């Protein structure tokens, strides 16, 4: 084959790759547009913009202490306005909803199933009580990330409501999509029923979650930092969405960070070893840490328990990890699927793939 033929072959290969990339981008754009349409369809009619809110409804006007301290009342009103105006989140009216049932309890508050009194549509409402306005700002940022990043596999947020109960107690209510259950609950049900996931089921779930995380890295420069089954919600039995962006970090200028974040069992080796050594700072690549956590999340779903993770947890030899994984997963899973997981849980961060590399690997192997 002469140089001209080689050049033509290379050009043809690049042309096919470009075409494939463009088709993938178009497919993602179509998915995002559909997600936006779904969001608009489900948007409650009580949602208003921050500029239209009557702040007096959200302040404890009758509080005796505030009545005798008008300067404090004025400060609270300013704090509340600042919180809402700077949030870029619409406001919803909790009085338009009836609480049906408490469906969950998180670190910062309870989650309820609520029904819109007028439309009868059901939603989830998270309610957080705090006496620290700084922590309120931090918690609010979690929901801003979800609201601003519309994707078919990221939980939809419709609005918030911030209220003062007295001179120092605030509540933050968040209205969002109502899922059937979180993935951790579904995995526990499978364990009780003795029903393992098939490879095709896991590939479908994996592709959904990976598409959201690829989108966050490539298009938004955001890392989640706490990927685990508890932070994945299931809709209609087959649709999986990432939730809980409380630890998420924008990485526009730097994708390495020193802070330790995440849940220890799903942490990358750098973070896990740092935690064991009681280190406060561990420099690591945020995206590659998320890839590792997603890999361990898949292993948990495969075994329906922590057995495989516990066996691999303290290993730093890639060949030993590979040997164990093949012994545990063959013949239930194909070589291609096992190889994808191995690339994700590579103990060496330098050679572990990020989500952009994972996107290509999914195309090539799955």
Functional labels for PLM-detected ranges:
Residues 40, 44-92:
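Juxta-kinase regulatory segment immediately upstream of eukaryotic protein kinase catalytic domains
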Residues 110:
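Conserved N-lobe ATP-binding subsite of Hanks-type protein kinase domains
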Residues 156-172:
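Short beta-strand micro-motifs within the conserved protein kinase catalytic domain, predominantly
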Residues 168-182:
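Conserved short submotifs of the Hanks-type protein kinase catalytic core
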Residues 205-206:
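Activation segment signature within eukaryotic-like protein kinase domains
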Residues 217-235:
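Catalytic-loop of the protein kinase fold
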Residues 257-275:
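Conserved activation segment of eukaryotic-like protein kinases, specifically the C-terminal portion
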């Amino acid at each position: 084959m002469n140089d001209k033929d080689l050049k033509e072959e290379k050009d043809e290969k690049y042309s096919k790759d470009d075409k494939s990339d463009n088709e993938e981008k178009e497919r993602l754009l179509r998915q995002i547009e559909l997600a936006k349409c779904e969001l608009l369809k489900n948007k409650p009619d009580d949602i208003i913009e921050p500029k239209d809110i009557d702040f007096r409804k959200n302040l404890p006007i009758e509080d005796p202490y505030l009545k005798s301290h008008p300067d404090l009342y004025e400060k609270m009103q300013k704090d509340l306005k600042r919180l809402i105006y700077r949030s870029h989140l619409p406001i919803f009216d909790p009085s338009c909803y009836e609480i049906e049932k408490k469906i969950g309890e998180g670190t910062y508050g309870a989650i309820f199933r609520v029904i819109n009194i007028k439309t009868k549509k059901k939603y989830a409402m998270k309610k957080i009580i705090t006496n620290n306005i700084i922590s309120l700002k931090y918690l609010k940022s979690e929901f801003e990330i979800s609201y601003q990043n519309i994707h078919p596999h990221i939980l939809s947020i419709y609005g918030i409501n911030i209220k003062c109960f007295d001179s120092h107690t605030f509540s933050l209510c968040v209205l969002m999509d109502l899922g059937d259950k979180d993935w951790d609950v579904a995995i526990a049900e499978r364990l009780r029923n003795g029903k393992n996931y098939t490879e095709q089921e896991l590939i479908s779930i994996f592709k959904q979650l990976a598409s959201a995380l690829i989108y966050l890295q490539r298009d938004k420069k955001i890392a989640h930092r706490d990927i685990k089954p508890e932070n994945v919600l299931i809709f209609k039995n087959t649709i999986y969405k990432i939730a809980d962006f409380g630890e998420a970090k924008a990485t526009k200028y730097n994708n390495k960070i020193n802070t330790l974040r995440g849940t220890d069992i799903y942490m990358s080796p750098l973070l896990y070893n740092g935690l064991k050594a009681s280190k406060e700072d561990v420099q690591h690549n945020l995206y590659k840490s998320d890839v590792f956590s997603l890999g361990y999340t898949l292993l948990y779903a495969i075994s329906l328990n922590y057995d495989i993770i516990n066996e691999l947890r303290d290993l730093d030899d890639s060949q030993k990890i590979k040997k164990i994984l093949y012994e545990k997963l063959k013949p239930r899973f194909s070589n291609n699927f096992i190889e994808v997981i191995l690339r994700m849980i590579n103990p060496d961060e330098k050679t572990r793939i990020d989500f952009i590399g994972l996107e290509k690997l999914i195309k090539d192997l799955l």
